[in-house]
Amino acid sequence: MCAARLAAAAAQSVYAFSARPLAGGEPVSLGSLRGKVLLIENVASLUGTTVRDYTQMNELQRRLGPRGLVVLGFPCNQFGHQENAKNEEILNSLKYVRPGGGFEPNFMLFEKCEVNGAGAHTLFAFLREALPAPSDDATALMTDPKLITWSPVCRNDVAWNFEKFLVGPDGVPLRRYSRRFQTIDIEPDIEALLSQGPSCA
């Protein structure tokens, strides 16, 4: 069994986990988001799709946040070292470099974490177990073995920056999307969940 899976195995929903905000302060319990639809992405500020995905994350949060969507971003440096800034440097990198132009995320960003390997954040260990492969590309894998910097390697590992996990209002992961699936194209799935109304979970 891959490391961190044991810690996540007993969890039934994302509400069992917490993460520290990028700006610092006390950890945020995902249980505080009960009843919301969550879109969770591992992000990086120096990736080829940073501009596209960050701006689309902002757009979804702007349009659907008032109806119950919460977008959560987790910076990760495990893929091509494309999030090599310190936590306190990431917001300035986004504002002045990429996407640049004064960009500010309107969604929740958390401290850098690992999503694969022995040091994986328990939330991502849980998400990977719940949804072992992206629904749009079940064979998605890290394409260059030289870039694998973690151990152990598992079949359900996140393959690159900007993989997405959609979580229902009961905290149960519903769908995983590959890096190639544009963030904005998840909107119909989010809309379907929002139209179901609040959960009593």
Swiss-Prot record:
Active site (record annotation): U47
Site positions per UniProt: Subject to oxidation and hydroselenide loss to dehydroalanine: U47
The protein's enzyme class: oxidoreductase
SUPFAM superfamilies: Thioredoxin-like
Sequence positions bearing N6-acetyllysine: K86, K112, K146
GO BP term (any one): response to hydrogen peroxide
Subcellular localization: Cytoplasm; Mitochondrion
GO cellular component: cytosol; mitochondrion
Residues where N6-succinyllysine is found: K86, K112, K146
Post-translational modification: During periods of oxidative stress, Sec-47 may react with a superoxide radical, irreversibly lose hydroselenide and be converted to dehydroalanine.
Modification type Phosphoserine: residues: S32, S195, S199
Chief localisation class: cytoplasm
Membrane-spanning intervals of the chain: none
Quaternary context: Homotetramer. Interacts with MIEN1.
Role summary: Catalyzes the reduction of hydroperoxides in a glutathione-dependent manner thus regulating cellular redox homeostasis. Can reduce small soluble hydroperoxides such as H2O2, cumene hydroperoxide and tert-butyl hydroperoxide, as well as several fatty acid-derived hydroperoxides. In platelets catalyzes the reduction of 12-hydroperoxyeicosatetraenoic acid, the primary product of the arachidonate 12-lipoxygenase pathway.
Protein name, UniProt field: Glutathione peroxidase 1
Organism: Pan troglodytes (Chimpanzee)
